[in-house]
Amino acid sequence: EDGVSCEYGTSNPSSLCLWGKQQGMWYRLEEYYYHSRLTGMSRTDEEHYAGLVALIAGRPVAKIVVDPSAASFIAVIQRHGAYLVLPAKNDVVDGIRAVSVALKQGDIRICNTCTDTIREFGLYRWNDSMHKDMPIKENDHAMDDIRYFVSTVLSERSDDFFVMATQRC
């Protein structure tokens, strides 16, 4: 089972990630990370879509979880009709908690091929000047797409609870 998570940016970086599930654990396998301010060139939605297709590279992706504010990119993916798109759940603080739990429990793992993700983990910080818990809005693009994936895909899991009814004698 494979999936993709997307944090879409125009002037800020776009971070797209290919996830693969094996033996109940999700692995962040590959990433597409494009920072237009560093390259000096913006990309269109179609160019980011081409990057998405290259990232997927023919794998059987079940769903693509996308930043819910990226309406134009969601529309491009839907127009091509190749993938199921889910707008991501976007509660920041609950999502960060869920990612922390998923990492601690080993539900997700980050492969060493995801260098921008690894770099961002070292730079991600809470904003101490705010009166509420919020991260600083820089070096958070891969962190956001991980949060989208965990909040949207891992939250779909069942807790294996069920009710059984039997006939009384």
Predicted features, each with a name:
Residues 2-5, 11, 97, 102-103, ...:
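Structured catalytic/translocation cores of nucleotide/phosphate-coupled proteins
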